[in-house]
Amino acid sequence: SMSPDGDTITLSSLKGKKTKLIYFWASWCSFCEEENTDLVRIYKKYKSKGFEVYAVALDEDKEEWLSSINKYKLAWINVSDLQGWDSKYVNTYNVSATPTTYLLDKENRIVAKDLIGYELERELESILNYTGPVN
């Protein structure tokens, strides 16, 4: 999908990042306002440790999408095909509401769904601080 600058950024390009959150949201989604604020805080805290957010907006209006990105200062990866609920991601990830989140591991496998706030932080702590089995 396209970034605001028109670049195509794929999820597969994020392989190797320790963990990433696919975040389905939209500028018209009132429940996403709180989620945006919370995620921005969590993103700032864990970004340097290998956490990335891949935010897929189910918007159709590019101006509204961009205006929301600026309003909430969403500095992570923002993409949208501006197809709303007809977005290919909706089927691929079985999204039926916004916000919906999937936490992915290094290999882009889904490890958790719809974790927010403290629960998300706890999971991130566990993933990002895991150094592998002790020999």
Regions inferred by a protein language model and the residue ranges of each:
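Hydrophobic beta-strand anchors of alpha/beta hydrolase catalytic cores
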Residues: L21-I22, V53, T101
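Thiol/disulfide oxidoreductase modules built on the thioredoxin-like
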Residues: L74, D81-L128
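Short acidic-hydrophobic, aromatic-tinged amphipathic segments that line or gate anion-handling sites
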Residues: M2, N78-D81
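N-terminal "domain-start" segment that seeds a small globular fold
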Residues: S1-S13, E125, N129-Y130
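Structural microenvironment flanking redox-active thiols in thiol-disulfide oxidoreductases
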Residues: E33-Y72, G84-V90
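The conserved SAM/SAH-binding core of class I Rossmann-like methyltransferase domains
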Residues: F24, Y54-L58, V79
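Short active-site neighborhood of thiol/selenol oxidoreductases, capturing the structured segment around
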Residues: T10-E33, L39
